[in-house]
Structures are given as structure tokens and as C-alpha cells.
């Protein structure tokens, strides 16, 4: 199966500047294509997983993935579909975040000097040295403000009478220049991104055409939500991070294990490397087979992101907890100061401190709704004092929020 054919078959396709021509070119030759990532955290989360899998698909078909870390543009902020102005990051934060993002990406793609090896660039390398007057002189005349004002991302802010600073308005010019720079210096002929980036991508392609006459393309992916409308990558407990220092492989496994029934087939297509035969089997699941399919999906996605050993450990932990009722040492763990437990802490405060509730009021609500357990026993009094007497084997306390969220408290 060719790159574009598989791209469409997996559900990645939304829009392309010239799909027929891009299909023909990628059949005849290998290209370089790039995707940009915000440099706003020390890890990517599953909201970026489709873009990462596209980079992986490019590499598998012999094309060269280029990853752009927005070290330069992160100093400004992308107004695209954002209701508020973004916080501007320091150089130190950007460098730290870039290191973590490369760690996320290295789980899925190979970086190096080979023809199809990925490279990662920070657009600060060329944007930081910009002279503003030179930029206006050399590139300003190629951009139409009339057209920029018609872009949905800008129009949305203006219609709501929300603040759109000149700083942010310049973001789309810089992203367009990124594409031009990569086309000129790395022979990059394709920019990929979410459908919310369409206007910025087209501006870059137009800039290249006007200056150099090169044939380049833009292609976007659909913006994904779960079947219930929730944003991919976010849960009530926070983001589903790819790096294990922010989210354990067990919690990563549990996220996919607990996905909605209606999402199984779509997630399998988007995020796994199951064969077509396996995908066909997912599409014809009987009701009694859904749980087994979720386990298989969670196992495969955890193996892809972390390792087969991590996937095995996550599966074994889940079996011990949910099927055998045991306590497993691989459960996520939080450490509580011994003095706190010796003095005693109320049940609702403990659930909040352990991260099983985002606020103390939410912890109270969890307990009042009979959703909280300590050492597998229902917590009936939110003010019950928890102390060292609750330690199992003098080591841990097991907290459970609902049937699927468990954590160990150690001192």
C-alpha cells in the first residue's frame, strides 16, 4: 500500500492543496515532509499521537520526516482557535521542553543522518536572527492582510471581540516562513498539520510559490474527539502524557483499556499497527468480545509507546487488581510524609493529596457518592481519620476512586 493510500485508509486525511498531484509525486519519489509541535510542555500527549503516527508512516514508506519544535514561535503564541492569549515561555523552559518532546517522538520514529531518518529542528535557529525591517522588506509584500482577516481562527476572535494582539497576528507569517525556509534549505515539499492549521499551511505554500515557484503541498488531518465529544489527550485527571515520568505505563494502558466501545475500531486504525485482517475482526466484534478487544488495543498501544515489557507489566497489574483483587507493586504510587500519616489525615484530604480528586470538594463528592475505597473497603465518612493503622504490611495504603482508578500511598 502506498503512503497516500495508507494515509487515507487509516483515517488521517482531511484536506489537501492538490491530492492527485501529491499522490503521483509520492509514488515516483521520496519527499521530505514536516510537522510542527508546540514547545509548551516537557512531553507530548495523545492529542499529538495521530501526528506522530503520520511521521512514523512517512518513515516506513521511505520519506523523510522533519520535526519542527516551535522554540521561536512559542515566544509569540499561536492564536489558532484559542480563546485567550498564551503565556510566553522563557528560553530555558523551551530548551527543557524540546528535550522532553524529542524523548516522546523517539519512541515512534528514528532520528539520525540516513535518507529517511527524522531530523528535529528548532525554528528559533532562523527566527531568532531575524531583523524586523529586513523581514518586512523581503517578505511583507507577499502577505495579504485582507486574506489574513478572513481566516477562521482570526475571525473567531474578532467576532467575539476578544483581544488579538499584533504579536499573535504575526504568528501565521512566521509559520509561513518556516515552510519557506524548510523548502529552501531541506527541500521540504509537504507540510502536515491539524485542520485548524489549514490557513497557515496554505499561506506558507503560497509564499513558496510566489518567491521560488517550487511545487509544494499542504495536507491536514481531522480534529479528533472521543465518541462522547471529549478532547483527545485530556481526562478529568489531566493529560494522557507519552513520557513515563509524567504518566506511568500502567495509567497509559488503563486509558486505552477504558476507552468507549464506539471508539475501539477508530482508535485501532489511527494509533495501532494491526494488520487489515485484525482490523476487520475489530469491526465485527460481538458484544461479549469488546472487553477482550479493549485489552488487546491497550496492550498494543502501550507496547508501541513504552515497550513490550511495560505492556506486559501493565496487563499483569490490571489482572491482579481487577480480576484477582490483589495489590500490585506496579500501581502508581504517591509518597506521603510519615509525620502527616502519624498525625492523621482526613479521608477526603488524602484522596485529594493522592491526586484522585482535583479538589477537596471533588474528593468529598467522590466519598459521598460511594466511589471511594481504602484498602478495598468503602469509605463512608469523608472526615474519617486515616493514620498509620491503615498501612498494609506496614508499607502502603491502597486508594481506589471508582472501579478503575487505583493508587498506592507510601510513607
Swiss-Prot record:
Q: Note the PROSITE patterns from the entry.
A: S4 (PS50889)
- Intracellular or extracellular location(s): Cytoplasm
Q: Check the record and name the InterPro entries matching this protein.
A: aa-tRNA-synth_Ic (IPR002305), Rossmann-like_a/b/a_fold (IPR014729), S4_RNA-bd_sf (IPR036986), SYY-like_C (IPR054608), Tyr-tRNA-ligase (IPR002307), Tyr-tRNA-ligase_bac-type (IPR024088), Tyr-tRNA-ligase_bac_1 (IPR024107)
Motif 'HIGH' region mapped to chain: 39-48
Question: In this UniProt entry, which cysteines form S-S bonds?
Answer: none
One GO BP on record is: tyrosyl-tRNA aminoacylation
Domain of life of the native organism: Bacteria
Q: Which GO terms describe its molecular function?
A: ATP binding; RNA binding; tyrosine-tRNA ligase activity
Gene Ontology CC: cytosol
Binding site residues for L-tyrosine:
34, 171, 175
NCBIfam families for the chain? tyrS
**Its job:** Catalyzes the attachment of tyrosine to tRNA(Tyr) in a two-step reaction: tyrosine is first activated by ATP to form Tyr-AMP and then transferred to the acceptor end of tRNA(Tyr).
Q: Name the chain's protein.
A: Tyrosine--tRNA ligase
The gene behind this protein is tyrS
